[in-house]
Amino acid sequence: KDCSVWDDKGQEYLDLYGGHAVISIGHCHPHYVEALARQAAELGFYSNSVVNMLQRRLAERLGKACGYEDYQLFLINSGAEANENAMKLASFKTGRTRVLSAVKAFHGRTSLAVEATDNAKIIAPVNANGHVTYLPLNDLAAWEAELAKGDVCACIIECIQGVGGIRMATEEFAQGLQAACKRHGAVLVCDEIQCGYGRSGRFFAHQWLGIRPDLITVAKGIANGFPMGAVLISPDFKPEYGQLGTTFGGNHMACAAALAVLDVM
């Protein structure tokens, strides 16, 4: 409950972990519990072939809360899925296949997301496809040199690295990288999965750095533990019917959870 957890012997602990930065409004928040129970009693799931008004409400509410009202919202089930779809969109938009990621980055454990993660132990041979180049965070010259080659579809960064050791991008680097991406036709992706949703004192960590990325990925705190991920998509991306898809993403229960989180925040 709230910031406390108990073990099987009744010992209470102050939870400073939050389930790996997931519990954004506390355990068993009464408004959250009530919202999920109410939604489960009404409709737990239906296909995305039918318009889900909860998705529209969430897109509007989240856009206003984070300052990206003009961005589109694509909903999925996890952070890895969010990053997969962000990099997929970048490749569609640019027609390119190469990604720049930071040394010590963590972006997920699937397909291209794991290839963009700087940890050889979790990259299976089938995932090592040579699409990703790792560069030191805050070494702007190194990123500019790679972008100048003209084959990069996306630069993906955590503005505050989590697994990488709470290392923050500098304002000079972030703004310079954004300018270089625009200059060379690449897409800037900010992975806000762990550092976003108010965790840094602003809604997104990149908002301390004076940049406005093309794509923003979120998960973890978005639904307080209910599986959900999302990509906020710049209006520069023209929607194409059927380009992205998901069975469970943005389901009624997940949307109810995410809306309850925004209510409390």
Question: Where are the model-predicted features located?
Answer:
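Conserved N-terminal phosphate-binding loop of PLP-dependent enzymes in the Aspartate aminotransferase
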Residues: 1-265
